[in-house]
A protein has these predicted regions:
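Short, Lys/Arg-enriched, disordered terminal segments
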Residues: 1-4, 174
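N-terminal Rossmann-like FAD-binding beta1-loop-alpha1 element of flavoenzymes
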Residues: 3-29
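Short beta-strand/turn micro-motifs composed of small residues
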Residues: 9, 32, 93
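Short, contiguous, pocket-lining structural segments
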Residues: 13, 39, 138, 142
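Conserved FAD-binding subdomain of flavin-dependent enzymes
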Residues: 20, 33-87, 100
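Flavin (FAD/FMN) cofactor-binding and adjacent substrate-gating region
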Residues: 78-161, 173
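Conserved beta-strand-loop-beta-strand element in the redox core of flavoprotein oxidoreductases
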Residues: 165-178
Length: 178
């Protein structure tokens, strides 16, 4: 079998790489042992534009969020599934310093952080004496649906080898890799 690309692992990276290679008409083989506790299989799939205790915007968020939204929706449409949804984060401040940090970002007109209008809305469910804020948009990639549906497509296209990758079997010469 002659292929252009060998992909090791069908996590979210292997899924996207195989998807885009397929769209470009490239040949590939994806090798995956379907390890049930692989990071992509146990991940919540959260795409959050804000990170850390200082509530800073993640690198390239303005580019990545629209791209991710469009890409997941396109792939979901092609597979006949819902691959992504928006679920904003309510950030309950554990102490006064976290509130100050968050509100400082709100005052700086941070693109993704907002004061939550009803500071008492969740008091019947949670104990939070320092208030809360909202981060939006935050996306959830439906990996629990996407990964198995894409895996089935790989099987149908005979581009998936379900086994452990053994690097010792890889033979690299100056003219080819087999």
């Amino acid at each position: 079998m002659q292929i252009d690309y060998l992909i090791i692992g069908q996590g979210i990276s292997g899924t996207w790489l195989s998807y885009y290679l397929q769209k470009e008409g490239k040949s590939f083989l994806l090798i995956d042992n379907h390890f049930k506790e692989a990071p992509s299989r146990i991940s919540a799939g959260i795409i959050n534009p804000v990170t850390g205790r200082r509530h800073v915007e993640v690198w390239m968020a303005k580019e990545i969020l629209p791209f991710a939204w469009n890409a997941y929706n396109q792939l979901g449409k092609e597979l006949g599934i819902s691959a992504i949804s928006q679920k904003n984060i309510i950030d309950f401040f554990p102490g006064p310093q976290m509130r100050v940090s968050f509100m400082q970002r709100v005052e700086e007109k941070g693109a993704y952080v907002f004061n939550y209008a009803d500071q008492h809305q969740f008091h019947s469910m949670f104990n939070y004496e320092f208030g809360c804020g909202e981060i939006q948009p935050v996306y959830t990639a439906h990996l629990e649906t996407l990964l198995p549906v894409w895996r089935q497509q790989l099987k149908e296209n005979t581009t998936l080898l379900e086994e452990e990758f053994d690097i010792s079997k890889l033979n690299i010469t100056s003219s080819k890799i087999q």
